[in-house]
Structure formats: structure tokens, C-alpha cells
Amino acid sequence: VDYAHKPEALATVLDTLRAATSGRLVLVFGCGGDRDRGKRPLMAEVVERLADGVLVTDDNPRTEDPSVIFDDIRAGFSNVDNVTFVAGRGQAIAQLIAGASADDVIVLAGKGHEDYQEINGERHAFSDLVEADHALTAWEVAHA
């Protein structure tokens, strides 16, 4: 779980983890709403270059339509065939972890320590750590 929400920070995280990965390097990420739209396609370029798999999802859409954010991110990928767009960050985390192998490294980027998701001007309780814990428990049961 990392707060990386800028292209440079995301590249640093992925480069660092790549060196320690024997399996795939996969991640969930999104871009915040009502913020710099120009970095959205740049984030996609970094992910496409450095990750083996990606689920794009919500990351504090605030008052912006999440589909517009997805479109901006989609524009940065040269090929979206291996990119999955999932509305609902909890669902994206669960889906990515459920499909992971034991030697994969999973990155949940963008929210870090935050314990909320800001949607339509309201903060809703949400934690990547809590969602990952639930998904990892389910993964362990499925792979026991």
C-alpha cells in the first residue's frame, strides 16, 4: 500500500519492487478527481511500462464523474487490452488479489494511509489496508 499519486512516485515504487519480484508485479491505481487531469495519462504510461498487470479504479473522485477520470487515464495506455477498469476500489482490490499467485507482488497505489474515499463531496470510511486484509484472507482460504 503506497500513497504514490504522481507519475514519478509511482515509477519509483514500481522500479524498486520490480527488483524484488520473482512473479508478476500487479497493481490497483486510480487518479483523484478535481485534481490535475494532465497527470492521469502519464500515470498510465508509467504503469504500462513497469507493471505486468493493472486494474484502474476510483481514488477519491470527489465531485468529478469517475468515467471521465477513467477516460483520461485510458488515453495514456497505448494498448488497453490488458487493462481492467473497475468501478469501486474495494472490488478492484478484491479482484486483483483473488487473481494473484503466491509469488506476485501486489501494489495498491494512490491512497496510502488514507482511511476514507471522497465521493460527491462526502467522505466515506475506506481503507486499502482493510480491503487488502479481507481479500488476502479470502485468497488464503481459496488456496489452502
What are these regions (language model features)?
Residues 1-144:
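ATP-dependent carboxylate-amine ligase
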